[in-house]
Structure formats: structure tokens, C-alpha cells
Amino acid sequence: MAWRTNLACLIKAGGRRWFPVPEYSSLPPVLNNTCSVRKSTAPEKRVASVAACDTDGKEPGNPLDRLFSLEQQASILQVLNTASDKELEAFRLLRGRKSVNIVEHRKKFGPFQRLENLIDVPLIQYKTAVEVCNSILCPENRRRKKSQEKWLLRKFIKPGVEQERLKAVKSIVSIVFGTRRIAWAHLDRRPTVLDWQQTECWKLTNKTYPTSFYLEEISSVISKIPKADLYILEKSGLSIQNTSLLPILLHFLITEAMLYALLNKTFAEDGQHRVLSINRNAVGKHFDLMIGDTRTSGRELVKQFLSESVLKERPRVFFPQDLLVQYRQKVVKSSYRIEELYDSLLQAVAFYELVFGKDSELKC
């Protein structure tokens, strides 16, 4: 897409980055539900093992019990008859209502006697039943899924940090900056918004600011930012090939470098990164805010979060009751777009959901 940008117009529009950025490669396809076939001297067992790890070509006319050996059937039935609904949700295809239906079916009709009984459970059809049995027998697939999750974290969150360390954090500060403002959102793992602010720092013009100016301005901002285990910065991904955006790109790089240096106070001592960057478009994809290569405003989504915090027992984000009205007025009644403020909150929520999943509090 050809795109022409006038720097003066960008500044007049309020300083936020309304220009296309290259979309990162799409997520990898879901791994096929396959696993290796162990050699066996018993032909009937080898055939059953193949059936257990390959769902292709199965027809409803082929009863479930014929696809698995007696030993495999016993293993599957043991899980189906003893696991709680929460334990059953560990299997991807049984998340939500299906796991509850299995437990309710057990209570109403007694333990499952045959694998074929699984099809009698509401919402579970033949193909789903076969894949559920496969996933119970092939834990390797779950290990591959965990490996895929680690790959996603390495791809979108940099520099690389051990997953165990990411999952040990108690609070983060998400920071987003533009050509006029710096905004931050301080969230714990619930996630509850502990602090959410923005400050005017500069007006980017055609003149060049000395490095000392950046140091003074950003040091002043950092003095207001709360302490946290990790600081998450937005990585815009602007292309250097668009020469008209070079002044803005340079501004972003200087600001980012200053934040990395000033917030990583103990890096020289322990070598541990406490400042990470997350790709802007990855957050946009996480919340379905992308239209082509361009990320749209997150204002409506933030307003939805504010409403759900009052209306829902388990909202996606919790807001302190004493600050809820203040935040809502700031978002709803603002006469100009404060995109940095919206994006700092969305970035924090996306980080927690990428690391912990949507029910992060339950995994603490």
C-alpha cells in the first residue's frame, strides 16, 4: 500500500502513530494430532496404537471401542470416570461446557462402561470423541503445545526471558509512548489496575532535541512510574524504508533506549532484564484490532473493560471502585484521542494473557 505521511500533519493530529506498520508473520498452524507408533510383536496392539494417534479417515460407522486396544480403553475410561471438570479442561477439546457435561453424565448414568458412551454426552460427537481419546493417550501433544506457547513468547516478547521467570512476576508496568505523551498502566496478576496515567512530555517538531533533553524529560517521567517486577514497552515496528517517518522513528528509538537504560537499574549487577518489549501488532492481533497492516483504536475495547468491571463478577480487568468513575470520565469524555493511555492498558492485559492465559489469577 502506498502511504504518504506529512510529519506536520501527524503532529497536529495529536501525536499518535496513525501509519501502517509491517504485520508480523501469522501464528503457526496448530500441530497435527500425531504421535509415534511403537514397534510391537503383537500385531493387534500395533494397529490399535495407530488408531489411537491418527484420527484421519475415521467414519462414524466404526465404533469407538474398535479403534483402541482393551488396555487403551481402560486408560481412557479411568480418566473419564475419575477426573473432575477442571482436570478434564486440561484437554483442549473438553474446555467449557463439554467437561461439565461429562461430569453431569457420570452423576446421572454412572461411570462410563464403554468408550461409545462418550458420544451420548451432549456436545460431543464422534469425531470429537475420537480426538479426546487420542489426546488422553498421547500426552506428547500437550508437551508440543507447551513448546508452541514458549515459541510464541519468544517471538513477540523480547529480549528472551525464561518462562518460569515471567510466570513469577507479581506486577508489571506497561509503558507506551508517542510523539507527545508517555502513558503507563500498573497491573497485578489478578489483573487489577493499580495505577493508570499519562503525561505530556514533548511536542515533536522539525527541530532536533539534544540528548540531554530526552534524559531530563524521561527521568522526570520515571520518577512518577511505580515500581514493578517487569516493565513492558511497546515496539512499534516502523519501517526504516519510509524516509518520511525517519524523524519519528529516531524519536522512538531514543526514547526506548532511555527507558531501557533508566529502568534496568540492576542489570549491571545481575544481568537480568527487567525491561521487555512486546510487538504492537501482536497486541493488536490479540484483541482483533488489526485491519490489514494497520492497527485501529482500542478506545471502545477499553470502554468495554470499564463497563464489565461493574457488570460482571469475573471481568477481564479489575478497576478500583474509588477510581472507576475517574477512569471512565477520562476515556468517555476526552475531547481528543489519548491512544497511548488506551494502548498501555491493552498491552498490559495482552502480556498477562499471553503468559498466563485469560484466567491468570487461577494459575497463580
UniProtKB/Swiss-Prot annotation:
Q: Does the keyword Phosphoprotein apply?
A: no
Subunit details? Interacts with POLRMT.
Q: What is its main location?
A: mitochondrion
Location of the transit peptide in the chain: 1-39
List the taxonomic lineage: Eukaryota, Metazoa, Chordata, Craniata, Vertebrata
Swiss-Prot/TrEMBL GO biological process terms: positive regulation of mitochondrial transcription; regulation of oxidative phosphorylation; transcription elongation by mitochondrial RNA polymerase
**The name this protein goes by in its record:** Transcription elongation factor, mitochondrial
Q: Which residues form the signal peptide?
A: none
